[in-house]
Swiss-Prot record:
Matches recorded under HAMAP family: HOA
Residues given in the record as Mn(2+) binding sites: 15, 195, 197
Family: Belongs to the 4-hydroxy-2-oxovalerate aldolase family.
Keyword annotations of the record: Aromatic hydrocarbons catabolism, Lyase, Manganese, Metal-binding
Catalytic activity: (S)-4-hydroxy-2-oxopentanoate = acetaldehyde + pyruvate
Phylogenetic classification of the source organism: Bacteria, Bacillati, Bacillota, Bacilli, Bacillales
Protein name: 4-hydroxy-2-oxovalerate aldolase
Stored SUPFAM superfamilies: Aldolase, post-HMGL domain-like
Taxonomic source organism: Geobacillus genomosp. 3
């Protein structure tokens, strides 16, 4: 495995927001950013779990307005870059400008893996604002490695400084990750990143697979705090990479203490691979489908796991929630209910 230094981007204050129902306070942000910054974490992502502009009835209301949290993070950090996530269609160029004014130095622009073309204007503005830019290809398992590489190439052409393979459903196996990193390396001139979810218990393993294949930017979250079963655990990743002789620039004891004494007390429960998360990882569908599948399953007398398996087979993506009732009805009819 290569010994090239790995840049870890910590997403506790963004993906972790999902796990605590977007209840971060300014004091939480101050304490977490200070601890991560002092430990040597180079990039800290701060925003609503669904990115800039995500606070809404649809995606969940933030306890504290995200621009206040970003401003607090930027004011607190001494060395780490403050980043924010932006999903075109949820966040707008207006929110991106506001986030820049509040102190972000990096924006991670996320699209469905097959829809990179919707990000062109956002990358354009980000470059005008002087931000480091990251392309974030979500649900990356849904395209072949070669198809994903072409979407990554689009993001690079729009101005992405890094392109991330994002395992949004936590469904990839290590070889899936390796194949996609290799495919991107063949066509890109910019570095590659990987964002894992732990729904199959493979977040650390998949992150190592990405590094083995040539990724140099890896997302992680202290205590693994994130959607579903969480993300690659920052302190564990730092320890493993240290054992392997791979430099991260992060002090292991300090990041362990940040997770133990600052992040853990904020958690409602530990991040575990429970039945719901495992179902998402196994079926490879969006976690937002789960609640709807449970409702449809109750209505039609069908196990919601069967609904999700069929949705995965049909390659349903976010925005196709209307398929859920159709699938439940079809399964019920097939069983003669």
């Amino acid at each position: 495995m290569p010994k090239q230094a790995i840049r870890i981007m910590d997403t506790t204050l963004r993906d972790g927001s999902h796990a605590i129902r977007h209840r971060f306070t300014k004091e939480n942000v101050r304490q977490i950013v200070q601890a991560l910054d002092e430990a040597g974490v180079p990039v800290i992502e701060v925003s609503h779990g669904d990115g800039l502009g995500g606070s809404s009835l649809q995606y969940g209301m933030s306890l504290v307005e995200e621009m206040e949290l970003i401003e607090e993070a930027a004011k607190t950090s001494r060395r780490a870059k403050i980043a924010a996530l932006l999903l075109p269609g949820i966040g707008t160029k207006k929110e991106l400008q506001q986030a820049k004014d509040c102190g972000i130095q990096m924006v991670r622009i996320a699209t469905q893996c097959s829809e990179a073309d919707v990000s062109e204007q956002h990358f354009g503005l980000a470059k005008e604002l002087g931000l480091e830019t990251v392309g974030f290809l979500m649900m990356a398992h849904m395209l072949s490695p070669e198809e994903l590489a072409q979407q990554a190439k689009l993001m690079e052409s729009y101005g992405a400084d890094i392109v991330y393979i994002v395992d949004s459903a936590g469904t990839m196996l290590p070889q899936d990750v390796i194949d996609r990193v290799i495919a991107l390396k063949k066509v890109l001139n910019v570095p590659i990143g990987f964002h894992a979810h732990n729904n199959l218990g493979l977040a650390i393993g998949n992150s190592l697979a990405a590094i083995q294949a040539g990724a140099t930017n890896i997302d992680a979250s202290t205590r693994g705090l994130g959607a579903g079963s969480g993300n690659t655990q920052t302190e564990v990743l730092v320890a493993v990479l240290s054992r392997m002789g791979i430099e991260t620039g992060i002090d292991l004891f300090q990041i362990m203490d940040a997770a133990e004494y600052i992040v853990d007390p904020l958690m409602d429960s530990p991040m575990i691979v429970n039945r719901d998360a495992l179902t998402i990882g196994f079926t490879g569908v969006y976690s937002t489908f789960l609640w709807h599948a449970k409702q449809a399953g109750e209505k039609f007398g069908v196990d919601p796991r069967e609904i999700l398996i069929e949705l995965g087979r049909r390659k349903a993506v976010a925005g196709q929630e209307d398929w859920i009732l159709d699938v439940a009805s079809d399964l019920s009819s097939a069983k003669g209910r």
